């Protein structure tokens, strides 16, 4: 089941996503987040996390770094700084060096 869902996301990334300008406000992109969540949490919880993330990605949020957390949650990762490297941090956070 997990491989089928990842395959569907890959089809989206290859065939549909290139037709539109980039609009994801987060890093990693929502489709990459979905794949990471499916790999880390399995098909059911990963799908729920991926859909939740996609719903959070809208013009009313600031966005930024939001990697898949180690524990299941439908909310934004509360500690993204644990995963940021210096380049990503400087890209998304103006107060970083």
Curated annotation (Swiss-Prot):
Kindly state which keywords UniProt assigns to this record, in alphabetical order. Cell membrane, Membrane
Question: Which Pfam family, giving just one, matches this sequence?
Answer: YidD
Q: What does the UniProt entry say about where the protein is found? A: Cell membrane
Record's bilayer topology term: Peripheral membrane protein
Q: Which SMART domains match?
A: Haemolytic
Q: Does the keyword Cell membrane apply?
A: yes
Which HAMAP family does the record cross-reference, listed alphabetically?
Answer: UPF0161_YidD
Claim: Metal-binding is one of the keywords in the record: no
Q: Spell out the protein name for this chain.
A: Putative membrane protein insertion efficiency factor
As for family, the record states: Belongs to the UPF0161 family.
Please give the chief subcellular localization of this protein.
membrane
Q: Cellular component terms, GO, for this chain's entry? A: plasma membrane
User: What role does it play?
Assistant: Could be involved in insertion of integral membrane proteins into the membrane.
């Amino acid at each position: 089941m997990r491989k089928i869902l990842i395959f569907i996301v890959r089809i989206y990334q290859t065939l549909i996503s290139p037709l539109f300008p980039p609009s994801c406000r987060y890093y990693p992109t929502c489709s990459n987040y979905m794949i990471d969540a499916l790999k880390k949490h399995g098909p059911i919880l990963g799908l729920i996390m991926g859909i939740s993330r996609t719903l959070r990605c809208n013009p009313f949020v600031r966005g930024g770094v939001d990697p898949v957390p180690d524990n299941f949650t439908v909310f934004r990762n509360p500690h993204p700084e644990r995963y940021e490297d210096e380049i990503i941090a400087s890209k998304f956070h103006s107060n970083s060096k």
